[in-house]
């Protein structure tokens, strides 16, 4: 018993979906699902960009803080 990999199982599922939603409604559902997936992927990419920008800002802050600390050490040595 091959689980759900059998073509007859998929045919039965397809038949049930057509009976539940009707042949005209299925393309609309698929279109809505596709738009939802695209929006999700776009937001995931946007989230990655925000994370990269945040990381760059943190690196710049650390570099600035290290430079400021080095400058204050130099001032104390000269004094």
From Swiss-Prot:
GO terms for biological process: protein transport by the Tat complex. Pfam families: TatA_B_E (PF02416). One of its GO terms (molecular function) is protein transmembrane transporter activity. It is found in: Cell inner membrane. The Tat system comprises two distinct complexes: a TatABC complex, containing multiple copies of TatA, TatB and TatC subunits, and a separate TatA complex, containing only TatA subunits. Substrates initially bind to the TatABC complex, which probably triggers association of the separate TatA complex to form the active translocon. Belongs to the TatA/E family. This is Sec-independent protein translocase protein TatA. It comes from Campylobacter jejuni subsp. jejuni serotype O:6 (strain 81116 / NCTC 11828). The lineage of its organism: Bacteria, Pseudomonadati, Campylobacterota, Epsilonproteobacteria, Campylobacterales.
């Amino acid at each position: 018993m091959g689980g759900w990999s059998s073509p007859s199982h998929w045919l039965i599922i397809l038949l049930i979906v057509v009976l539940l939603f009707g042949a005209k409604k299925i393309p609309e559902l698929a279109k809505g699902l596709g738009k939802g997936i695209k929006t999700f992927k776009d937001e995931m990419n946007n989230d990655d960009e925000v994370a990269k920008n945040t990381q760059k800002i943190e690196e710049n802050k650390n570099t600035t803080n290290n430079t400021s600390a080095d400058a204050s050490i130099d001032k104390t040595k000269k004094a």
